[in-house]
């Protein structure tokens, strides 16, 4: 029904479930996002009550726990190999400074966040194939940022739109 509704104005979409695609850690060294994704999936599977029942009865939730599994594995290996027995909060500690190529990139040393449009890599092709199959109403792309440099991007706010973005991309 969801795909039919995209091409048919006579379909009553209010009776269809909303499709949500949640993607995490496109940069493998942003590991807290993949961990948050697993916690969110667990919550959705384990929670009880009318609110969660209503959400799950009216929503199709697609999880991609790691857009970049190769980078996440590389980062996890680095962090686990270089961590101290006692957590070291010093930002200059070796654990927090990966050597090249680090976990940001995938197996081919490519920044997966730059492959949304060209769709050259296997991970991106699989992701786009899933998008074409489900046509999600909502897509989330969870990133990790420094504690003093976070921001929230909300499409549709005129003051947040780059003036070089063509109007057709905004419509």
Predicted regions and their residues:
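Second-shell loop/turn segments in exported
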Residues: 23-30, 113-117, 166
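Short amphipathic alpha-helical face segments that pack within enzyme cores
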Residues: 35-43, 126
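Sec-exported extracytoplasmic/periplasmic mature domains
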Residues: 42-49, 117, 132-136
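Proline-aspartate-enriched helix->loop->beta-strand connector
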Residues: 131-145
